[in-house]
Amino acid sequence: VSIPQFPKLDGDIHTDVLIIGGGITGVLTAYFLHQNGVKYALVEKSRICSGVTCKTTAKITAQHGLVYHKILADRGAYLSQKYLKANELALEKYCEICKNFDCDFERKDNYVYSVYNRRILEKEMKALEKIRSKAEFCENIIIPKKTVGAVKFPNQAQFNPIKFIAKISEGLNIFEETFVSEMIGTTAVTQNGKIYADKVIAATHFPFINKHGNYFLKLYQHRSYAVALKNAQNIDGMYVDENRKGMSFRNYGKLLLLGGGGHR
């Protein structure tokens, strides 16, 4: 897949909205602003889609682990429903956009399983029932691992994010190899010029300017691994362990992708 290349910033510019970060969040933001006629600029310190986005297992789902019982306990039913609805709308928006591009978009069921903790699955299901989710409890799932059950979100999706970015980035106002070294209000200072903006959207993986929270002291490197197996079974869905140290599974074409082994 060939991702379009974009020039470096060369001199000062003015824009209504500055987006910092060229992963899927930043590029999608630029895409929507472009569609709506808003003057914008996106800057990326290296190449777009060269960080987290190009290494993801690329599941699009409103199911982010077993989070709904926690949100329900902390925020109540109304905000839990809002969170669910927002993510369902985002999924449908992806579906709408992907109709126009070849990016291997497929609707698939998503499962969060547990190897030993059935109680946490049942707790999550009770929360999902309270907020009227379409989730289902599954006693048995088709993965090469013994489980005690799974929470299923039907009709979620998977895709190829590199193919997706390659298509939606065409024609966007992007500057690559443009590193923001300092923010002065809403003005970004780079090695090749300043960007004067009315609004700034930070779409980087972590805070890049040390303002509040001293995040640079709290950050740590986390690594996980993925392998692609040939001649493996078709599991017809996307699966992830509720335990952070567990494994994820999904098919891509004739391959079976296995992820896991996360550690600091």
Task: Provide a role label for each language-model segment.
Residues G26:
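N-terminal Rossmann-fold NAD(P) dinucleotide-binding loop
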Residues Q35-K55:
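Glycine-rich FAD pyrophosphate-binding loop
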Residues G21-G23, K45:
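Glycine-rich Rossmann-fold phosphate-binding loop(s) that bind the pyrophosphate
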Residues G51, K55-A86:
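Glycine-rich active-site loop/strand segments that organize a redox cofactor
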Residues M125-L128, A150-K199, A203:
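Helical element adjacent to the flavin cofactor pocket in flavoenzyme catalytic cores
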